[in-house]
């Protein structure tokens, strides 16, 4: 009788061990699946973020090129204006300098 009870306990222990092993295997499978899903989601988010960044970069760099061209045109116009102004007043400046240099004050 005792032998039958021991055999029954050993069988129950083996069954419990199989249940624990099955649960452990199922848990590991779920963890592996969750990790793969998380990695996929992270990769998708990274791709999406990178694409958004590239779109913004292209949009702003296009504006930057237009701004540079506009600034160059404005600078050239200002330089031309200053050259014209200098040419216009240079005779007056020379006359004023000659007058002040050649005039003696007592």
UniProtKB/Swiss-Prot annotation:
Signal peptide: none annotated. InterPro entries: V-ATPase_G. Its main location: membrane. One of its GO terms (cellular component) is vacuolar proton-transporting V-type ATPase complex. Residues 33-58 have a biased composition (Basic and acidic residues). The keyword Lipid biosynthesis does not apply. Residues 31-67 are annotated as: Disordered. Keywords: Acetylation, Hydrogen ion transport, Ion transport, Membrane, Transport, Vacuole. It comes from the Eukaryota. It is a peripheral membrane protein. GO terms for molecular function: proton-transporting ATPase activity, rotational mechanism. It is found in: Vacuole membrane. Gene3D superfamilies: 1.20.5.2950. The modification N-acetylmethionine is found at residue 1. The keyword Cell membrane does not apply. V-ATPase is a heteromultimeric enzyme composed of a peripheral catalytic V1 complex (components A to H) attached to an integral membrane V0 proton pore complex (components: a, c, c'', d and e). Catalytic subunit of the peripheral V1 complex of vacuolar ATPase (V-ATPase). V-ATPase is responsible for acidifying a variety of intracellular compartments in eukaryotic cells. Belongs to the V-ATPase G subunit family. This is V-type proton ATPase subunit G2. It comes from Arabidopsis thaliana.
């Amino acid at each position: 009788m005792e032998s039958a009870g021991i055999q029954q306990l050993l069988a129950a222990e083996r069954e419990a061990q199989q249940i624990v092993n099955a649960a452990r295997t199922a848990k590991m499978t779920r963890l592996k699946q969750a990790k793969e899903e998380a990695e996929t989601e992270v990769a998708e988010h990274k791709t999406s973020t990178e694409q958004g960044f590239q779109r913004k970069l292209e949009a702003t760099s296009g504006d930057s090129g237009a701004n540079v061209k506009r600034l160059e045109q404005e600078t050239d116009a200002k330089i031309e204006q200053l050259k014209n102004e200098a040419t216009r007043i240079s005779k007056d400046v020379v006359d004023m300098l000659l007058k002040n240099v050649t005039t003696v004050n007592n």
